């Protein structure tokens, strides 16, 4: 399985302290999304010579910066990861620096390529190329963040977002 060789203490920490933070975000960025990105990231990681513990942590932290707003969430997520002293039990300062960069680089709508393979893995996993899921999450995000829009404007916003992010 994907979690077979995962450090159990790290996994317990993420499950108890990090993933619950996603419960406060819109449905498109809730715990289900975080778990999907973790699973997809670990599945992709099997094809590369990478540290699976790092991939797991990067995926777990990738959207926690939404606590401070959407626009710079990728930067805030990196700051939150780097400031989490608990991670020093499992990772060196150099690994944490790479992880921070990967979290900062994960954003699919970013105008630059991720700096490392870790950023590329999580960015790709976060894209979630399943069309029905993409549309559902885009609609959920719109309803949660733009409640003033009527049905027609929600549809227009959805199409604009999908065109910008995936076209």
Where are these predicted regions, by residue range?
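Short, small-residue-biased leader/transition segments that mark boundaries at the very start
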Residues: 1-2
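Short alpha-helical hairpin
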Residues: 6-20
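Divalent metal-dependent phosphate-bond-processing catalytic cores, especially two-metal-ion Mg2+/Mn2+ enzymes
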Residues: 8, 23-50, 61, 110-167
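An amphipathic alpha-helix signature
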Residues: 11-15, 38, 54, 78-82, ...
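An active-site-proximal "capping" alpha-helix that borders the catalytic cofactor pocket
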Residues: 37-41, 72-87
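His-Asp-centered metal-binding catalytic motifs of divalent-metal-dependent phosphohydrolases/nucleases
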Residues: 52-69, 73, 77, 97-108
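Hydrophobic, well-structured mid-protein blocks that either form specific transmembrane helices
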Residues: 79-115
């Amino acid at each position: 399985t994907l979690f077979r060789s995962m450090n159990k203490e790290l996994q317990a920490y993420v499950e108890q302290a990090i993933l619950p933070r996603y419960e406060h975000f819109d449905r498109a960025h809730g715990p289900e999304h975080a778990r999907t990105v973790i699973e997809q990231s670990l599945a992709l990681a099997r094809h590369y010579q990478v540290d699976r513990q790092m991939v797991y942590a990067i995926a777990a932290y990738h959207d926690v910066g939404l606590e401070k707003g959407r626009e710079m969430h990728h930067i805030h997520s990196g700051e939150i990861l780097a400031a989490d002293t608990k991670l020093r039990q499992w990772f060196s300062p150099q690994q944490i620096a790479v992880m921070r960069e990967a979290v900062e680089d994960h954003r699919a709508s970013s105008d630059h390529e991720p700096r490392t393979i870790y950023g590329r893995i999580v960015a790709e996993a976060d894209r979630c190329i399943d069309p029905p899921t993409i549309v559902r999450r885009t609609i959920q995000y719109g309803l949660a963040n733009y409640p003033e829009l009527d049905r027609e404007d929600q549809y227009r916003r959805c199409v604009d977002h999908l065109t910008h992010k995936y076209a």
